[in-house]
Amino acid sequence: MKKYLALALIAPLLISCSTTKKGDTYNEAWVKDTNGFDILMGQFAHNIENIWGFKEVVIAGPKDYVKYTDQYQTRSHINFDDGTITIETIAGTEPAAHLRRAIIKTLLMGDDPSSVDLYSDVDDITISKEPFLYGQVVDNTGQPIRWEGRASNFADYLLKNRLKSRSNGLRIIYSVTINMVPNHLDKRAHKYLGMVRQASRKYGVDESLILAIMQTESSFNPYAVSRSDALGLMQVVQHTAGKDVFRSQGKSGTPSRSFLFDPASNIDIGTAYLAMLNNVYLGGIDNPTSRRYAVITAYNGGAGSVLRVFSNDKIQAANIINTMTPGDVYQTLTTRHPSAESRRYLYKVNTAQKSYRRR
């Protein structure tokens, strides 16, 4: 009971904290938020380990939807990178019933992340008439799953034919794994094309870049969260990118979590921030390809860190970049940027953007 209580106490705090992943604006309050959020996430992971066992900690992330129910004894895990859905339970009584209920709810859940608390065991998943996973999963007869009857039949089939169990030394873990369709990534991307096109026209940002950022940040997971509290499809942080965009639009404060979990709003804010990087923070870079490389890297690590790769003086940095070929700028950012994550990020986004340009 104590460990369940600990999780109940942690969950509200997790929702209230926020930090940053992008941008160069740091202040004391942000540092406190960052440290506090990281500590709380560590405590959350520790308590999951106490319940599930060593090496059995699974927590929601940018490309992983993870929802616990049944006093944290049942969980649904969608890996949007691998294209797998794993439903597991450690319930000591009627584990099949717990799995069946979780399978049906996961298959039929909607796409409203603001209504689901990923850090509590509250069963707040509502069955939707237009399930988020519709078309990304097919049942044993090869049909997409929209209605509860088909989801229930598929759950029964899975429990009869694919139920597995394993022991971690302390508990028996029962599980069922569902493979998503091979083109699940494209299926998710297609859901947001209209929103991407609208934001592209509004801010003058290439559609292929927006899609590449979304793929790299979240694999088109609208429930995406990170340990740095970046939220939604484009992993926007309230107090940095969100605040910058609001200020540029004449709004005070920062966008709320529910606002950033709304796909259209998230894409709008993320695209507006890309436009700010391109037109304001890195506007001194003349060559559009060189500037695109800088913008991509800055979306991950901040404009200041990009310019400092070339010079501590921002104006001089832009001047140096303007004497280089785009290929040299790319090579420099992917080899000399101090952040390994940012170096890899440019490669990933640039590669993804090429694939969207060919479509």
Curated annotation (Swiss-Prot):
Reactions catalysed: Exolytic cleavage of the (1->4)-beta-glycosidic linkage between N-acetylmuramic acid (MurNAc) and N-acetylglucosamine (GlcNAc) residues in peptidoglycan, from either the reducing or the non-reducing ends of the peptidoglycan chains, with concomitant formation of a 1,6-anhydrobond in the MurNAc residue
Covalent lipid sites (N-palmitoyl cysteine): 17
Function noted in UniProt: Murein-degrading enzyme. May play a role in recycling of muropeptides during cell elongation and/or cell division.
Entry's transmembrane regions: none
Lipidation (S-diacylglycerol cysteine): 17
UniProt keyword tRNA processing, yes or no: no
Keyword Flavoprotein: no
Family statement: Belongs to the transglycosylase Slt family.
Topological relation to the membrane, as annotated: Lipid-anchor
One Gene Ontology term from the biological process aspect of the record: cell wall organization
Subcellular location(s) of the protein: Cell outer membrane
HAMAP family: MltC (MF_01616)
Sections of the chain in a coiled coil: none
EC number(s) recorded for this UniProt protein: 4.2.2.n1
Originating gene: mltC
Official protein name in the record: Membrane-bound lytic murein transglycosylase C
Signal peptide: 1-16
Gene Ontology molecular function: hydrolase activity, acting on glycosyl bonds; peptidoglycan lytic transglycosylase activity
Domain of life: Bacteria
Record keywords: Cell outer membrane, Cell wall biogenesis/degradation, Lipoprotein, Lyase, Membrane, Palmitate, Signal
GO cellular component: cell outer membrane
